[in-house]
Amino acid sequence: MKKIIMTILCLLLLTGCTTYEDTNGDDPALQTITDQNIILKDIGASGLGYTTMELGFLHSEEYSSKNFNGVEELFLANYIWASDVTVYIGHLNLKSGNFKLVLVLDDEILFEIPLDAFAETYTFNNIKGTFAIRAAGESANVEFYVEVR
């Protein structure tokens, strides 16, 4: 009985996972997932693994995937008072597929991280509201490092 329930549960979880094919060759731009999907986070994600480290206000994560699909929220914070937020990208390496890494403030994309980012620091002043870092991928073979201070 346990095996039947686990099998049904696994099948239900997998039905929510959608694979997005890379239909535009070497162009890394997203083809199916829109900015609106990223802002609303209205589609799920699969295939993205990570390791995380938190030391006080420092939050860092190393991500990698051979086949990342969907929209994944990497960081979320609600700033009640105007705050300065620093995002450090250690590296971003897209090997194949389509990928976008963005910073979202409330209901708009604040900034898109360049796909060739390497040891880049981005500082945003007077951030107030819901701040998120989101990744979107379509069959993306990608690895990247993100740190939020």
Name what the model sees in each region:
Residues 118-122:
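Short strand-edge motifs at loop-to-beta-strand transitions and within beta-strands
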Residues 1-4:
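Positively charged n-region of N-terminal signal peptides that target proteins for export
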Residues 139-149:
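Exposed low-complexity, polar/acidic, P/S/T/G-rich flexible segments that act as propeptides
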Residues 85-88, 123-141:
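Noncatalytic modules at the cell exterior or secretory-pathway interfaces
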Residues 13-16:
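C-terminal motif of bacterial Sec signal peptides marking the signal peptidase cleavage site
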Residues 95-111, 146-148:
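Short, surface-exposed beta-strand/strand-loop-strand elements in extracellular ectodomains
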Residues 82, 93-98, 137-141:
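Short proline/glycine-enriched turn/loop motifs at strand-loop junctions of beta-rich domains
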Residues 19-78:
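Transition segment at domain starts
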